[in-house]
């Protein structure tokens, strides 16, 4: 039996998650499909970073922000699929069929593309056996600062992320060393100066050539590095290794011949501020959508999502209101409001 949804959202980052919430608010039967095992998009790459620029929201850690987004997205019980990679979308009469890499088919009246910059995966360290240390002390992101307290840390990379981590970890760590394969760091000059002033040791023209394990072979104990100019090598004892070599962005989504959407820079979908694209029934929100006057920040993402969902609502129901009702007067929240107020009034023990 085919389950047909009003809207299928592709992408579980901030744009997709808020679209799921707003679709429920507009009374749409909603499905969200995310290729990764976790929802949250690229914010997951920086769980310890503070986000400052969301209206009415005090500075919030990326990890907490994602948890709140997910909780909000589930308000109206959408169907959510993770570990599900969409690779092809076709148009069939009045429906869209969303095909996944495993051969599944999902049927929908509309599609909302919220895939951001694509499927993002860190560039791995290309040394034999490196993968076995990913469960111990080889890291591709900083999930928790607590992990690095009083530790000797080696960071490989010279971009903004690498030097930001060096600056942020230096007050906590026993020592921080940055190695970079080129002769000049690509991070912002001011951040590099901040790292140097904080006591971070920076070694350019240097790469990791070998990882040496501890006695029980469960973690990295020594790292061998080589200077590409002098050809000198040395071995350093470390507690934690962070690899910051950038990210691979996979953009494998394709369409059948009946679907044509112009792209900018051969990736971003050109559309309108309303979330509409050149293909009726396909909408977009967030980083993947390009239009004049777009705000490429999180706060703009939420407006993109609301506009796209409102466009979907009127596409499916031309007589529907163009915008959703404000939450303070929306009957959908009546019971939820009562429950929250009652909890606020009950004294804590």
UniProtKB/Swiss-Prot annotation:
Its EC number is 1.18.1.2. Keywords: FAD, Flavoprotein, NADP, Oxidoreductase. It is an enzyme of class 1 (oxidoreductase). Its cofactor is FAD. It holds the Pfam family Pyr_redox_2. It catalyses: 2 reduced [2Fe-2S]-[ferredoxin] + NADP(+) + H(+) = 2 oxidized [2Fe-2S]-[ferredoxin] + NADPH. FAD binds at residues 34, 42, 46, 86, 120, 287, 328. GO terms for molecular function: ferredoxin-NADP+ reductase activity; flavin adenine dinucleotide binding; NADP binding. Binds 1 FAD per subunit. It comes from the Bacteria. Belongs to the ferredoxin--NADP reductase type 2 family. Homodimer. HAMAP family: FENR2 (MF_01685). This is Ferredoxin--NADP reductase 3.
